[in-house]
């Protein structure tokens, strides 16, 4: 279903369902023989009865059949699992480095089913703020509580839409602008229109003390990437029609939920222009460094992981 400026969701619908897909990949990676990451909370979060339909929809999206005549475009579940494992490992390391440098205030934007507050070894005095829609945060809190899980850090939920005045909601939850902060925007940018992306970066900058850090998953925004995305959308439309004719479930497709409006900022350029020291790592290179073969130079492995520090 196309996005609208004021749409909303719970964990089983729209953008919320993409968090389930990501957690399914983390659960699969954790259960593998040589996992890059260990997320013992992913499987409990995605195995509830209320998510049965979403699990089936994601499985159908990941499925490959002999009739799929565009194998370069067909979603490969192992490719996605590998990519999301590499991504999770990178941003886990980012937080570990941040707290080692003395940062004790953490903000996870669009937290979804992120379990880092529960599974990372946070030093005493660390506070983790999770921002997402109320129904998404409620689902995670109640599900983990039923499994007896308790956060390692002080966890504060901030139930607010990132398209609204989330900085005020964050401050109301106890966030202190005078303290250095480690921010994370993982898997977020495509789900925000360009204006909201600019506003997000502006708010991060305005609420960051000296010594703060930010990490952002960067999706292609240049003209070549935009044209490639349009071509992929056309190819997927043809493939979707064939799958529908075979009776396959095509109701889940994260790309349907992305905004593709003009003017989306490059986070590395944006933060550099605002005085931050930036670095950027291509996901494919990071995968190779970790011993995971990037399946292709297409798809998610062309994404970049951007980090920046405020002097």
Curated annotation (Swiss-Prot):
- What is the E.C. number? 2.1.1.-
Entry binding sites for S-adenosyl-L-methionine: 132, 161-162
Q: What class of enzyme is it?
A: transferase
Q: Which domain of life is it from?
A: Bacteria
**Transferase among keywords:** yes
Q: Which Gene3D superfamilies match?
A: Vaccinia Virus protein VP39
Q: Which GO terms describe its molecular function?
A: methyltransferase activity
Q: Where are the transmembrane segments?
A: none
GO term, biological process aspect, one:
methylation
One Pfam family, short name = LCM
Q: Which UniProt keywords apply?
A: Methyltransferase, S-adenosyl-L-methionine, Transferase
Entry similarity comment: Belongs to the UPF0677 family.
Name the NCBIfam families for this protein: mthyl_TIGR00027
Record's protein name = Putative S-adenosyl-L-methionine-dependent methyltransferase MMAR_0358
